[in-house]
Regions:
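Conserved SAM/SAH-binding beta-strand->alpha-helix loop
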Residues: 67-69
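A short acidic, Gly/Pro-enriched loop at the edge of an enzyme's catalytic core
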Residues: 97-104
């Protein structure tokens, strides 16, 4: 993982300005589901665009990423937008997610299949997971992309068997290079 960290640090160090906030259409479309004041975790947060959006919806946000530089950029974006987020530098390959802690977990453009069970377990009962990443159709746009980091059609719908799927677009449309799912942790009975 160290070489991955170095690669991401280098990428973000080369950024000369704090970027404008980019709102992912998925967050905008499903904002009503994500509103609230509970704790949210943004995995592989990068420069924290998703984290800032969640904070704007009222959430207390922990932005987790392997790149300190990216999180520092994210803190500046948050300050400019008038919200607070907590940045946490961690290697997702070695950082255990705490169980039953978060009301919302987001993960955009990062694929580590081994984390799928831990993501579901980290949700409080009734909590929401919002997951979006590249699928195999992304190879049409970026042929050299490593296919190990791409979801296969139908894979995402099967990846969180203990959660209830609220909505899932799972790569069946060849023109969509992303798959996404929103899933809910079961309520305790």
């Amino acid at each position: 993982m160290r070489s991955d960290v170095d690669r991401w640090e280098e990428k973000y160090r080369d950024a000369t300005a704090v970027p404008s906030l980019i709102s992912d259409p998925l967050l905008v479309h499903y904002a009503d589901l994500l509103k609230g004041d509970g704790l949210a975790l943004d995995l592989a947060a990068g420069t924290c665009h998703t984290s800032v959006q969640l904070a704007r919806l009222g959430r207390q946000v922990v932005a987790l990423d392997c790149s300190l530089t990216a999180l520092q950029i994210g803190q500046r974006i948050a300050a400019r937008e008038g919200v607070r987020i907590q940045g946490l530098v961690a290697d997702l390959d070695n950082w255990p997610l705490p169980q039953s802690t978060f009301e919302v977990i987001t993960c955009f453009r990062y694929l580590n299949r081994e984390l799928f069970p831990a993501m579901g377990n980290a949700l409080k009962p009734g909590g929401l997971l919002l997951y979006k990443t590249f699928n195999q159709h992304h190879l049409r746009e970026v042929p050299r992309f490593n296919p190990n980091y791409l979801l296969r059609p139908g894979e995402l719908a099967r990846s969180f068997p203990d959660l209830e799927l609220v909505v899932c677009r799972d790569g069946v449309n060849a023109r969509e290079p992303y798959s996404f799912a929103i899933a809910r942790s079961p309520q305790k009975t």
